Regions:
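Histidine- and acidic-residue-rich, metal-dependent catalytic cores
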Residues: 1-181
Length: 181
């Protein structure tokens, strides 16, 4: 769907900005690039009626939607570098073990996997979706801070995002406007 493409592009842009701000190396930026670009490729098999539902998903629809990460892993496994596969496959994992699909914990997740998890959330909050408008900056910052304080996502990464929030958004908007012209 067009929404998924826009979300993918913003997740990629946010993840790369965060990676640069955290001084990850060139090879790690490449892994971030491909992992974030491919993180939702499994959504190609999710029905549009679920992807673009103008309401909260039912439990069954959410179960189907969550399958996209497993499908992503299956599509990429064996054809992409294992680190890229893991970045894409693990973007819904949470540091305290409540994420999916594996319920991994902090010690199981690399810095790059954590960066894309934050980039994905930032994109979801910043972007307009079929079921919601984009959130204002202060609400986005509050949600990210709460998730970090509750041990779901990396406090270190969120601190970088909060400190450089306006720059991250500004760079994304400039890039998006150039792409849309």
């Amino acid at each position: 769907s067009q929404q998924t493409v826009l979300h993918t592009m913003s997740t990629k842009a946010f993840s790369l900005e965060i990676g640069k701000l955290m001084n990850v190396g060139t090879r790690d930026l490449e892994i971030l690039y491909y992992g974030s670009l491919l993180h939702d490729i499994g959504k190609i098999v999710i029905p549009l009626s679920i992807l673009e539902a103008p309401r909260r998903l039912t439990d069954e629809e959410m179960r189907i939607m969550k399958a996209h990460v497993v499908i992503t892993g299956k599509i990429l496994e064996g054809i992409m570098d294992e680190r890229i596969v893991n970045v894409a496959y693990r973007h819904h994992e949470k540091l305290e073990g409540t994420g999916y699909p594996q319920g991994l914990r902090a010690e199981d997740l690399s810095l790059l996997e954590r960066i894309v998890a934050v980039g994905d959330i930032l994109s979801a909050l910043y972007s307009k979706r079929s079921y919601k408008d984009s959130f204002p900056p202060e609400k986005i910052k509050g949600i990210l801070k709460d998730d970090a304080d509750n041990g779901k996502i990396s406090k270190e990464i969120v601190d970088v995002v909060l400190k450089k929030f306006d720059d991250i958004i500004s760079r994304y908007e400039k890039q998006r406007n150039l792409t849309m012209e």
